[in-house]
Amino acid sequence: MQISGMLTMTVLSVMLVICAPGRSTRRISFAKARWMMAGGTGLIALQFLLQHAFGFRQMGVTQAVCCNLLFFTPSSLLCSMSILYMQRQGKVSWKEWLIGSSIYALSAGILIGTAVLDGVPFREESMALRIAEYVSSVLYVVMQTYIFSMQYKAYMRLETAVDEYYDRSRRDLFGWMGLSMKTMALMVFLVPLVIFMQGAPLVIFSISFFFIISYSTISLYTYGVSKDVERVEEAEMSEEGIVKSEKFAAATESSLLSSAGANFSLFTIHSTLNRWIESGHYREHNLTLSIVARQMGVPQKQLQEWLRQSEYKKLAGLVSSLRIKEAQRVLIEHRDWSVESVADYCGFNDRKYFHQVFQQYTGTTPAKFQQNN
């Protein structure tokens, strides 16, 4: 198991370092994140190598736990921070790095200092080292909880930006982040309990951790070299532009401008929405907030504000509602059309998503709706 784990982690590290396309490595967020993830998987490979070479698990739990914590903690730090880098487009402050690194430095200092000063040979069981390991495992939980809190905030911000920007649910773009965060957070709280065990619980934990890190690594690589990262960053940049616009408007302290903007939003969007609907633009594929705002001839910021205050809440709500109404009409008037043809005509990218949204709005499937009407 140790040899296979070491080889797998080595392959993952090499994949991140060597196999990334040039266009992806020029993207700041992925360029840094892949090196951090490669460092994390490399440390795990080194940990497996030391465990196998010196037989720590066979010598006793104390030595194995000490080795695990010394390598497992910085590995988790690097892997977790690499995901945070992707979430924030590389915008991680030195203070945030310093806090995480300081916690690890304290943990490593306690372990190494105890092993050197307690007077007990490392190959023998040591109560002092065991206590130091308990303290170190608690520090590990503190470090990972701190990072997870930052990841969660960044994930929620991305989720909001993407949900409001695209014409349909796009969790497929960054869903791996949420799964990686949740599974790694679960492993974090199991570490202080499982790491001191032997037998089946430790084996199950080790295998689970191995697969979680592998999944996160492969997902980060796939995401980094795909177009998905550009789509997420486009939505995020749009949201940041709107926020900056709001701050600038607030800084002007001009009630006249604010009033004019509000009147523009209320009057213009309502008057242009019907023209936009009549034009059939809502049936176009892959609409975004910026595209719709340009088609309607209104500022993107005010369109977003109007959507938030309306019954639709976001662009996907507006577009999906219009597309489903159109789909109902087409299903009745063109009974010879296939479901795929109806979905494509109404702007849905695939049949599965069309079925999902249609059932959500009507409570039935397209086929049953057509039979009953």
Regions found by a protein language model. Give the residues of each.
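N-terminal low-complexity or simple alpha-helical regulatory segments
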Residues: 1-110, 125-128, 135
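Alpha-helical transmembrane segments of multi-pass integral membrane proteins
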Residues: 26-46, 100-102, 129-194, 207-215
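Membrane-helix interface motif
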Residues: 112-122, 153
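Membrane-proximal linker segments that couple transmembrane helices to downstream signaling/catalytic modules
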Residues: 221-345, 352, 357-360, 364-373
